Amino acid sequence: MSNQELEAAIEAAWDARDSITPATTGATREAIEETLAALDGGGLRVAEKQADGSWHVNQWAKKAVLLGFRIKDMEIQSGGPQGGGWWDKVDSKFAGWGESQWKAAGFRAVPNCVVRKSAYIAPGVVLMPSFVNLGAYVDSGTMVDTWATVGSCAQIGRNVHLSGGVGIGGVLEPMQAGPTIIEDNCFIGARSEVVEGVIVREGAVLGMGVYIGQSTKIVDRETGEVMYGEVPPYSVVVSGSMPSTGGVSLYCAVIVKRVDERTRSKTGINELLRD
């Protein structure tokens, strides 16, 4: 089916979602499975960047991810320690892969990383022991470091570094209108969290332990401007606080400067790790 045909089929299935079960067959099941396969292979994305820099969200693709839960039964997934396993209804992206599939995929997956079916991982990505949820998109040259989490339908650009323990929020629960987006060439410092559909624009650097959601104040130290929901391109952002009522200060994220060569030397990717 074309994307237009898939969209129409998914929208119809969404309207009748309460009737969809693992026993569902025919065009409805085919549309859901084909959409999930397109997401998995990178031919379709939940969100796409437009020429003017805005992001268009394919809401129907997000709906297909949710409908995928309706057509699968729970089952044992083997491979745990001491012969144990897991109980789930979402397949691993790597289920049934042999050497030829790994070579064709072109990314590195360190033992104990988890990627769920319908997430796309581009060639040149390095996955340390981390978690990438369904519907996500991780573009080429990106490092997903140890214990980092890429949430459902999140969009991660090229040559991004997600440091240890970083959390990039998903959209499925609680439901968000748009996915969390990290654009190309960003550096997200250890244990930082970016959630609720926030967009981190190209080349931005978040220091260690920066937390940004839609209600987080993002303050430009130089101008005093306060913004929400979007980190400007090539900003260097650290944790801070702002005075509030009652003599207390509340958390905020502070833009302390724009990226310069000194910052780039500390946050640049190491090509040796991508070979």
UniProtKB/Swiss-Prot annotation:
Its main location: cytoplasm. Substrate binds at residues 108, 145. One of its GO terms (cellular component) is cytoplasm. One of its GO terms (molecular function) is 2,3,4,5-tetrahydropyridine-2,6-dicarboxylate N-succinyltransferase activity. SUPFAM superfamilies: Trimeric LpxA-like enzymes (SSF51161). Gene3D superfamilies: Hexapeptide repeat proteins, Tetrahydrodipicolinate-N-succinyltransferase, N-terminal domain. InterPro entries: DapD_Trfase_Hexpep_rpt_fam, Hexapep, Hexapep_transf_CS, THP_succinylTrfase_dom1, THP_succinylTrfase_N_sf, Trimer_LpxA-like_sf. It catalyses: (S)-2,3,4,5-tetrahydrodipicolinate + succinyl-CoA + H2O = (S)-2-succinylamino-6-oxoheptanedioate + CoA. It is an enzyme of class 2 (transferase). Pfam families: Hexapep_2, THDPS_N_2. It is found in: Cytoplasm. Keywords: Acyltransferase, Amino-acid biosynthesis, Cytoplasm, Diaminopimelate biosynthesis, Lysine biosynthesis, Repeat, Transferase. Pathway: Amino-acid biosynthesis; L-lysine biosynthesis via DAP pathway; LL-2,6-diaminopimelate from (S)-tetrahydrodipicolinate (succinylase route): step 1/3. Its EC number is 2.3.1.117. NCBIfam families: dapD, PRK11830.1. HAMAP family: DapD. Belongs to the transferase hexapeptide repeat family. This is 2,3,4,5-tetrahydropyridine-2,6-dicarboxylate N-succinyltransferase. It comes from Ruegeria pomeroyi (strain ATCC 700808 / DSM 15171 / DSS-3) (Silicibacter pomeroyi). The lineage of its organism: Bacteria, Pseudomonadati, Pseudomonadota, Alphaproteobacteria, Rhodobacterales.
